[in-house]
């Protein structure tokens, strides 16, 4: 089922029930843009001048780990250092945009496809490591904002037990408000899914004891790239 088409049909039925046409008009878009431009933002906590340092500090508070390299070509070596240090497999799925990096030179096998489930595999996952980029990283909270799309499939960040995110330093914004403003400026409309990732998955449902990896990755590792 094509999910974008299904979403459009649902929205069209809602608009019909409201007595409006099936498609959003330019006037409606302009009204929303005008509201967002005029709507005052609440008070914002200060963010230090070095957004990368602020992001690292907050990400580590959320139990993410962070590495930093100078260029994209150094990412495969950084990934291998990380997976070898934890005795993880040298095999991962990744977003299409990362497929051209020199993975094989570092002895890493990377397939650009969504992760597969394997009922016989560890924790019901056939693919244990997922490598993604991100739309922006948020310094205030140490979070990653991912936008879903054909080549930026959210499953790579949600299904494998280890999520590795490649983040250019130039894509670090101050706060969530700036992240959404940048989304509107660059994309104009929301994607099918927007994921805000703040460290590994966790839950405290049972006896208020925090357990990592209950509903998603056990680990989130961020590789900052100075010249992304």
Please tell me what each predicted stretch does:
Residues 1-228:
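The feature marks the mature, well-folded catalytic cores of soluble enzymes
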């Amino acid at each position: 089922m094509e999910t974008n088409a299904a979403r459009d049909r649902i929205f069209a039925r809602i608009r019909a029930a409201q007595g409006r046409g099936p498609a959003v008009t330019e006037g409606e878009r302009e009204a929303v843009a005008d509201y967002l431009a005029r709507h005052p933002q609440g008070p914002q906590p200060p963010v230090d001048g070095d957004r990368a340092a602020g992001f690292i500090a907050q990400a580590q508070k959320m139990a993410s780990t962070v590495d930093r390299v100078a260029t994209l070509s150094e990412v495969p070596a950084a990934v291998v250092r990380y997976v070898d240090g934890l005795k993880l497999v040298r095999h991962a799925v990744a977003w299409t945009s990362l497929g051209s990096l020199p993975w094989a030179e570092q002895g890493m096998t990377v397939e650009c496809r969504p992760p597969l489930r394997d009922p016989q595999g560890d924790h019901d996952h056939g693919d244990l490591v997922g490598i993604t980029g991100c739309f922006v990283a948020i310094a205030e909270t140490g979070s990653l904002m991912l936008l879903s799309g054909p080549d930026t499939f959210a499953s790579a960040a949600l299904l494998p037990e280890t999520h590795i995110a490649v983040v250019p330093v130039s894509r670090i914004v101050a706060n969530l408000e700036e992240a959404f403003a940048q989304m509107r400026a660059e994309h104009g409309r929301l994607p099918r899914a927007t994921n805000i990732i703040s460290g590994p998955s966790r839950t405290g449902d049972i006896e208020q004891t925090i357990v990592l990896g209950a509903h998603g990755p056990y680990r989130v590792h961020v590789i900052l790239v100075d010249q992304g």
